[in-house]
C-alpha cells in the first residue's frame, strides 16, 4: 500500500511531500518527492491521550476506540483504577482483554492506589503482590498515578514497595499531587514520580516542570486546565503532553486531543511544539509501540486537509484504515458484563440529617463545587431546619449530597453542597471516584431516594428525577460502563445532561462529571465518602456541624 502527502517530520521539524510504502503494518519506505505542496493533504503521527480513565467515558475500551479514532487518536495511556476499585486485578485484566479486540493501542497502567484511601469502602484492593503481577505483564506499561502523595512524602512501606517495583521493572511512574509545591514537590519527584496531570495554576506547573517533572495539560469534561497551563509549552516543549483524564461520551463525540491542538495553534504556539505534546512526547516517555512516521515504524498516522483546523480525514493504525471522513471503521462489539453490586433500596428517612435542639447558633459545613475544577472549597452556612431536621434549601442553592455504599448495606453518609444549582429533583450515579459507591445530590430526601434506588435497581447507572419524571442511563459493566454503541450512549447522556440542566436547573457545565468527583478524597478541600464528610487538608473526617 502507498500513501502520499505533505509529511511532517517531528524530529527535524520539516514538511516535505513524500510517499509512504506500507507493508505488513509497518512503514517499509519513505520517498521524499520534493517540497511541501499547498493543497495536498498532510500526514503526521497520530494523537495520543497521555492520561485517561477509559471508564469515565462510560464506554468499554472497544467502544471508546470507535469514537476516538475519528478524531485522529491512535493510542491512550490509560489508568484502569476505576474498574480496579470495583473488581481488583480482574477488572484490569478485563480492560486489557476488551481493548485487544480492536486495533487501537491501549497502554494500561498498574493501579497504585486501590483503594485511594482507607477512609472509604471500595470493592477491591490491589496490593503490592498484585502490582508486582501486573507490572510483569507486557500490556502494563507503567505504574499508574500515585495519588497517595502523603504516603510518598512519609515513606509509607506499601507505597514505597510499589514504587520500588516499578523501578525494578523499568517502567515509568505517574504522579498525582494537586497543589504540591516547593521542597515537598521535589521530594515527590525525587522518589520517582515523572508526570503530573493535576496542576491547576501556571505557577504550580512552572514549579514542577522546572524541577524536572513532565506536565500533562488536562482538558476533560470536568477538569479544564488548558488555559492556565498552555503557556508552559513555549519554554518546555519536551516536557509537555496533552490529556483528557476523564471525558464523557458527549464531549468525546465532539473531539479529543485534536481540539487541544487547534486551540494551541490558535493561540500562536509553534506547530511542531504543539505536535510534540500531542504526538511525540507520550510515545517517547511511555515507550509506546506507536509509530512516529519513520521507516520501520508501525504505520500509525493520520491525514488532515490543512494545518489550521486539523480536520482528520483518515486515521491509520498498523497500516489499517480505522476512520475516514468522520466515520469509524472500528467494529461495534459487545462485551462481557461483569459487576459487583450488593445493596438494598433506600428510604427517604435514610437521608435525614438531625440536629441536636440544644445546640446554640449551629452552622453547617458545605462543600463548594467549582465548575471546571476537581478541587472544592469548604464553606459555612446557617442550616435550614424543619422540626430539628436539616434540609436542603434550593433558594440558597444549598443541596443535600449523599454517598451510599454499594458493596454492602450501610447507612448513607449525608452532607451539604453548593453550586449545583438544582431547583428541584435529584441526580444519582454509580460513578463516584474512586471507590464508585453511589453518589447523589438533590433538593429533598424523597427525590434523592428515588434517584438512588433507580441506580440500585439497575445495578449501576446515571439517574435524574423530578416530579413524576425519571430518567436512567444503565451502566451494567462494573456500574461504570456500557457496551452499547458509543454514539447511542452519547445521545442518551446528552438527553440526561439536558434534563439535569433544563428541567432540574443545574448551572454546571457537566453536572454528572462534577458529581462523580465529590467523593474523591485525595483532591482537597472538602469531600464526602460513604463513611462521612472528609477534610482533605487535615486528611481526616470532620463533622457536618461546625458548632
Residue ranges, per PLM feature:
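Divalent-metal coordination cores built from histidine and acidic residues
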Residues: 65-172, 472-474, 511
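Active-site neighborhood of phospho(di)ester-bond hydrolases with catalytic His/Asp-centered motifs
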Residues: 44-51, 78-81, 109, 144, ...
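Short, ordered loop/turn segments at secondary-structure junctions
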Residues: 80-83, 111-112, 148, 178-179, ...
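Short coil/turn connectors at secondary-structure junctions
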Residues: 1, 38-39, 43-45, 71-74, ...
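Histidine/acidic residue-rich metal-binding segments in metalloenzymes
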Residues: 91, 125-145, 151-216, 221-242, ...
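Active-site microenvironment of metallo-dependent hydrolases
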Residues: 1-18, 23, 31, 69-71, ...
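Divalent metal-coordination and catalytic microenvironments
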Residues: 25, 40, 51, 72, ...
